[in-house]
Amino acid sequence: MQTFETLSLNIENHIAHVELNRPDKANAMNLPMWGELQTCFESLSDDPEVRVVVLSGAGKHFCSGIDLDMFAAIANDSQSEPARKAEQLRQTILRLQDNLSAIEKCRKPVLAAIHGSCVGGGIDMVSCCDMRYCAQGSTFSIKEIDIGMTADVGTLQRLPHIIPQGVVRELAYTGRNVEASEARDIGLVNAVYENREALLEGVM
């Protein structure tokens, strides 16, 4: 079984449990995590022992979004010419899109088990999954608007296939939080469980 720096993987009874494993950083998505998600899901897609994949997060939150240190590293890159720096950013975004598309392309059903906060890049991630479930107290937010960014890694392309377009636009324009009960009402999640333990037991 593969081992990863930012993920934990366990396969039992034909269920692959992939857990985001940066709890001290609220599972913020650093560069290694993006690459490992692609490697992991491409492998699980071809694994004959795996019939379903459950994606969850360790610690208090599912995912706090993209690790902003990634962008600091890009901004501080040695490229000084604006055009070259812009092209480098474009190539980085294309790679990140490919990383998450591996979840969407996985040949096995992927179920997201969400607790705590699911923000920004976390929304990109769960919108790639086939089904989403959450615990009471979970919150969802397309936060990119608050830092002057576009949700350009898949949220705006995938969410309109999951929830109504008008709701997608409202959430993208305002960055407001969606609580668990509203997430169920708008169809973002299939069901809400009492707590994280009940969530994982129910989804498994």
Where are these regions (language model features)?
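Short hydrophobic/charged patches on amphipathic alpha-helices used for structural packing
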Residues: 6, 41-42, 97-100, 123
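Hydrophobic/aromatic residues within transmembrane alpha-helices
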Residues: 18, 55, 67, 125-127, ...
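Glycine- (often His-adjacent) and acidic-residue-rich active-site loop
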Residues: 57-99, 148
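Histidine-centered beta-alpha loop that forms part of the nucleotide-sugar donor binding/catalytic region
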Residues: 21, 66, 115
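Conserved CoA-thioester-binding segment of acyl-CoA-metabolizing enzymes
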Residues: 1-58
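Charged catalytic carboxylate motif
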Residues: 32-36, 95, 102, 202
